[in-house]
């Protein structure tokens, strides 16, 4: 699972949500 290094946990989540899709 690859996610961008974002400073905000919310953005991370979002990234995880997109990756997951």
Curated annotation (Swiss-Prot):
Q: In which tissues is it expressed?
A: Expressed by the venom gland.
**Coiled-coil regions, chain positions:** none
* Keyword set, alphabetical order: Neurotoxin, Secreted, Toxin
Superkingdom field: Eukaryota
Tell me the compartments it is located in: Secreted
Q: Name one GO molecular function term.
A: toxin activity
**What would be one Gene Ontology cellular-component term for the protein?**
extracellular region
Family classification = Belongs to the scolopendra toxin 8 family.
Protein name per its UniProtKB record: Scolopendra 7997.01 Da toxin
Taxonomy, top ranks, is: Eukaryota, Metazoa, Ecdysozoa, Arthropoda, Myriapoda
